[in-house]
Structures are given as structure tokens and as C-alpha cells.
Amino acid sequence: MSQFSHFNEQGRAKMVDISDKSSTMRTAVAASSVRMIKEVFHKIEQREIGKGDVLSVAQVAGIMAAKQTSTIIPMCHPLALKGVDISFDWEEDGNAHILNIQVQVKTKGSTGVEMEALTSASVCALTVYDMCKAIDKGMIIGPTYLIEKTGGKNGDFHRASDI
């Protein structure tokens, strides 16, 4: 098992020094989902939610979240992201509908973008919940997980199967 690098000699948290790491292309893809009743699905699709176009707002919120990850996750480095792409698709499951969210983040730098992708996917889901909670407070968020990451000295990661 590898040692955690976010602790100093005193066992206190520190931001890892990445100044000696080479700059390479880094990507990460993360996913989340929101399970909801049919009524919410139909109102989102018909753009009848009082707070606005849910998917457009969630998409912008997700992009903003990716760019702000280092301000809310203490040990994340601020990164100059090169791209954030968010896609949505619907799945029907009995009486419920599931909004699947997928986020791809890219940069060229000396640290990965997994946390940016995960934060973005999470904030997309939270935004959908916030905009629709007046209709259904029983929506279920998640799971939220990393699908893949590329670049860096630890190599690539590709999830073996869907969750």
C-alpha cells in the first residue's frame, strides 16, 4: 500500500509539492445520477420547472464547480483546466427516471483532474436536486464515481464495469 503524501513529518495536513513533476496531458471522466419521479422528469423535459432550464443551469454549475474545486477541497491544487464537457442522458426504471450525468475534464499540467471531474458531477446532481426539490424531496443522488483517468506517473485507470 502506498503512503499518503498529504501529511508532513508531524502528521499534519500539507499540500503536496508538485513543482518537480513534468507537465503532461491529464484527463478524467466521472459520473453521477439523480433518480426522480416521472413528474419531475416530465417537468424538466418540458422546461416547466419554475427556477429555469434545469439541465442548462446544472451544466453551467458543473463547469463552474470544476474550475473552483481547489477552493472547496483543501488539498487540491488550483489548475488551469483546458476543457470541461458535461453530458446528460435519461434512463427509465419502472416508475422512476434516472438522469445520468457524465463529466470529462482535461488539462495539461503536473497533477490530475479526478477531483475536478468528481466535484463537477456532484454539483451537477446537487443543482438538479435544488431546482426540483419543490416537486420531489425524495430524489436520490448517486452513486458518484470515477470512470477513468489518464496521464501521470501512476498511469491510467479505467473502471472495469459500470456501478
Swiss-Prot record:
Keywords linked to the UniProt accession: Lyase, Molybdenum cofactor biosynthesis
Alphabetized GO MF terms: cyclic pyranopterin monophosphate synthase activity
Top-level taxon in the UniProt lineage: Bacteria
Role of this protein: Catalyzes the conversion of (8S)-3',8-cyclo-7,8-dihydroguanosine 5'-triphosphate to cyclic pyranopterin monophosphate (cPMP).
Pathway note: Cofactor biosynthesis; molybdopterin biosynthesis
Gene that this polypeptide is encoded by: moaC
Location of the active site: D130
Recorded family membership: Belongs to the MoaC family.
This protein's name: Cyclic pyranopterin monophosphate synthase
GO biological process: Mo-molybdopterin cofactor biosynthetic process
InterPro entries per the UniProt record, alphabetical: MoaC (IPR023045), MoaC_bact/euk (IPR047594), MoaC_sf (IPR036522), MoCo_biosynth_MoaA/MoaC (IPR050105), Mopterin_CF_biosynth-C_dom (IPR002820)
Top-level class of the enzyme under EC nomenclature: lyase
